[in-house]
Curated annotation (Swiss-Prot):
InterPro entries: Topo_IA_Znf. One of its GO terms (biological process) is DNA topological change. It comes from the Archaea. This is Uncharacterized protein MJ0664. GO terms for molecular function: DNA binding; DNA topoisomerase activity. GO terms for cellular component: chromosome. Pfam families: Zn_ribbon_Top1.
Length: 301
């Protein structure tokens, strides 16, 4: 069994939605580009944005090309730890064609833009639905995945394998998005929506972006990559966040969001935790169950 699934977004819809949101902010202008309109004999990025008049900006105006010509790969990653423990993780990768990126960079350089931004969209519902689909299929067809899921079911005291699969999908989503938000200093936001990541930082490929066999890969597991984001659009809270460290002269003070989180708060959904007692033992479970499957067990002495 191949634990890898490809999927493409509707790129026109992705760009339309992003530009519609950005156009509501006075600091952003956004325009679609195409080779026919601009009479170029090379490839042009799918879009162009300017960022104007932000406080303490390093430049009066920033100009960036935008490309969203990616395909997505979903994977159930199978791992054996140094101690011999079998593990599985749901993962997502955004794949760009390197030759396509190089051609679009020519347009960016020729027009003296500040850089080319890779646009990706991350959606919680899509990730969890795809992870559940792949884990369910894996449980039926892959002995490695089946063994790990059965172990997770017993360890976490779930009643059935469907609940276990939903737990793993949510666990992996929250792990990925939590690390990204921490590295970006945006723990108070949803993490869903649009990310604009520079292909290059200080004239080099941005740390965390993988180049492999003619592919430019954004792997969400490389969360340090997101420290270099230029713009993030939170589609759940309708917020636009730009990277002041990259665009402004004064570094912003990072809000101490972690101080607002205590041991009695669910890190997945923000609801309160409660003690759940079963025949197998007890644990702290989310009061939002069964919509949220988070649970924490007391540490063994």
């Amino acid at each position: 069994m191949k634990n890898l699934v490809l999927r493409r977004d509707n790129m026109g819809e992705v760009l339309n939605e992003l530009f519609e949101i950005l156009s509501k902010d006075l600091h952003f202008n956004a325009t679609k580009l195409n080779s026919e309109t601009y009479e170029q004999n090379w490839k042009v990025p799918e879009g162009f944005i300017s960022i104007i008049g932000i406080e303490n900006a390093k430049m009066p105006v920033f100009y960036y090309g935008i490309t969203n010509s990616y395909k997505k790969e979903f994977e159930i990653k199978k791992v054996i730890s140094p101690k011999g423990q079998k593990q599985i993780f749901a993962r997502i990768y955004y794949i760009f064609d390197r030759r396509d990126i190089i051609e679009k960079e020519k347009y960016v350089v020729a027009n003296a833009f500040n850089g080319l931004l890779l646009l990706i969209k991350f959606d919680k519902t899509e990730f969890i639905e795809k992870a559940i689909e792949m884990l369910t299929k894996g449980y039926e067809e892959d002995n490695f995945i089946k063994e790990v899921l059965n172990n997770i079911k017993e360890k976490n005291m779930f009643d059935n394998i469907d609940e276990t699969i939903r737990f793993v999908a949510n666990r992996d989503y929250n792990w990925l998005i939590g690390r990204i938000k921490y590295n970006m200093g945006i723990l108070e936001y949803s993490g869903q929506g649009y990310y604009l990541i520079p292909i290059k930082t200080n004239m080099q490929i941005t740390p965390g972006i993988k180049i492999n066999n003619g592919r430019v890969i954004i792997d969400l597991e490389n969360s340090h990559l997101f420290k270099n984001f230029i713009v993030y659009v939170d589609t759940i809270n309708n917020k636009i966040i730009y990277n002041k460290e990259r665009l402004c002269n004064k570094n912003p003070a990072i809000l101490d969001i972690m101080s607002k989180i205590d041991d009695n708060t669910c890190p997945w959904c923000g609801a309160k935790l409660r003690v759940v007692r079963t025949k197998k033992g007890e644990f702290l479970g989310c009061t939002n169950y069964p919509n949220c499957l988070y649970r924490r067990f007391p540490k063994k002495n």
